[in-house]
Amino acid sequence: MIKQRTLKNIIRATGVGLHSGEKVYLTLKPAPVDTGIVFRRADLDPVVEIPARAANVGETTMSTTLVNGDVKVDTVEHLLSAMAGLGIDNAYVELSASEVPIMDGSAGPFVFLIQSAGLEEQDAAKKFIRILREVTVEDGDKRATFVPFEGFKVSFEIDFDHPVFRDRTQSASVDFSSTSFVKEVSRARTFGFMSDIEYLRKHNLALGGSVENAIVVDADGVLNEDGLRYEDEFVKHKILDAIGDLYLLGNSLIGEFKGFKSGHALNNQLLRKLIEQKDAWEVVTFEDASTAPISYMRPVAAV
């Protein structure tokens, strides 16, 4: 049986919020079967919990924000991408502020944290959502689609009319496994344009952004001294974002996601449309791991 997973140990990290610029303390904790991923604002009294679910998404400007009343948690997508990538079903994410720390702008540091904590299988079957028919949402020329696929595949295309983008591929496709996620996707960093930074900061966004946690592009090229981690790092980061956004379904997916110029808002619209259309999906479990169409890393003890 493919079992649900949580963390073996509690683990902590510190960073800054990309948009708030605030110092944030992050604690990842094990959680019982069928808890899902639950964010906790530990700086509030009483502590406020926000389950990582599509229905709890409030803001989608520049990042995905979860809300519970007037309490929010910003920029959840990179951490959720790491949770999805390593097949973590249940965990508590405690924060000392309203935003998940940006770390280096990718999911890599969160993958390292989770692997350092160790993974533990739980005594319950892991639930997958299998896509049964096509579901699409569009906004102008932007599009996001689910189609049936025996596995989990994420295909994405961006379309930036800029020399840095025109000179390299703007499309990519990843046939998901924990290994392909860690190697091909997890280290892709968020990116932004120098020309946008002044506008963003006027609107209290990207206050913590720098070349330490993002790829910064100006009219001539990439400003980061060390360049890109992957030749297709820009579109790979969009795939990373999508994997995190899609994990707000609350379960791992069996199907293909296709995005064209999609972002956090459209990704969330697609999830909400899918959830409404009950004939477009089913929940499945696997008694025999060898018959499952998705491969996860075996749990290893924390070292």
Swiss-Prot record:
Record InterPro entries: Ribosomal_Su5_D2-typ_SF, UDP-acyl_GlcNac_deAcase, UDP-acyl_GlcNac_deAcase_C, UDP-acyl_N-AcGlcN_deAcase_N
Catalytic reactions on record: a UDP-3-O-[(3R)-3-hydroxyacyl]-N-acetyl-alpha-D-glucosamine + H2O = a UDP-3-O-[(3R)-3-hydroxyacyl]-alpha-D-glucosamine + acetate
GO cellular component: membrane
Necessary cofactors: Zn(2+)
EC number, UniProt record: 3.5.1.108
Pathway assigned to this chain's UniProt record: Glycolipid biosynthesis; lipid IV(A) biosynthesis; lipid IV(A) from (3R)-3-hydroxytetradecanoyl-[acyl-carrier-protein] and UDP-N-acetyl-alpha-D-glucosamine: step 2/6
Residues reported to bind Zn(2+): 78, 237, 241
Extent of the signal sequence: none
Active site: 264 (proton donor)
Organism, scientific name: Pseudomonas fluorescens (strain Pf0-1)
Top EC class, one word: hydrolase
Source superkingdom: Bacteria
Function statement: Catalyzes the hydrolysis of UDP-3-O-myristoyl-N-acetylglucosamine to form UDP-3-O-myristoylglucosamine and acetate, the committed step in lipid A biosynthesis.
Family according to the record: Belongs to the LpxC family.
Protein name: UDP-3-O-acyl-N-acetylglucosamine deacetylase
